[in-house]
Swiss-Prot record:
It comes from Granulibacter bethesdensis (strain ATCC BAA-1260 / CGDNIH1). It comes from the Bacteria. Belongs to the universal ribosomal protein uS13 family. Located at the top of the head of the 30S subunit, it contacts several helices of the 16S rRNA. In the 70S ribosome it contacts the 23S rRNA (bridge B1a) and protein L5 of the 50S subunit (bridge B1b), connecting the 2 subunits; these bridges are implicated in subunit movement. Contacts the tRNAs in the A and P-sites. GO terms for biological process: translation. This is Small ribosomal subunit protein uS13. The lineage of its organism: Bacteria, Pseudomonadati, Pseudomonadota, Alphaproteobacteria, Acetobacterales. It holds the Pfam family Ribosomal_S13. Coiled coil: none annotated.
Length: 125
């Protein structure tokens, strides 16, 4: 397995597919990296030379924020919103949807498992 940006990428897959295993690199960025370094689409990771792997590694380190740095940046952005006390920060703090989705029904992923409410107690006369 080739190791790029601290991630072991699979060797039997195509380069553009394998690069997606790195957090912060999606389909468009992976394709852009391959075209920028003139790596053919059908080339697999185990067919790359050490020089090509080194060029990919250097390009990603130089041009992209990936893995820990990107996760830290996203977490800091969310923390900043929460510290500001703005609407989005309050929604993050309460664990509710941030982008305007309805919450009367749905939003179970964000709110967690539904808690059953005990039915009304019957009053005996």
């Amino acid at each position: 397995m080739a190791r790029i940006a601290g991630v072991n990428i699979p060797t039997n897959k195509r380069v553009a597919i394998s690069l997606r295993y790195i957090y912060g690199i999606g389909p468009a960025q992976a394709q852009k990296i391959c075209t920028e370094l003139s790596i053919p689409d059908e080339r697999r990771v185990n067919q790359l030379s050490d020089d090509e792997i080194l060029r990919i590694r250097e390009l990603i380190d130089r041009e992209y924020r990936v893995e820990g740095d990107l996760r830290r940046e996203v977490a800091m952005n969310i923390k900043r919103l929460m510290d500001l006390g703005c609407y989005r920060g309050l929604r993050h703090r309460r664990g509710l949807p941030v982008r305007g989705q309805r919450t009367h029904t749905n939003a179970r992923t964000r709110k967690g498992k539904a808690v059953a409410i005990a039915g009304k107690k019957k009053v005996t006369r």
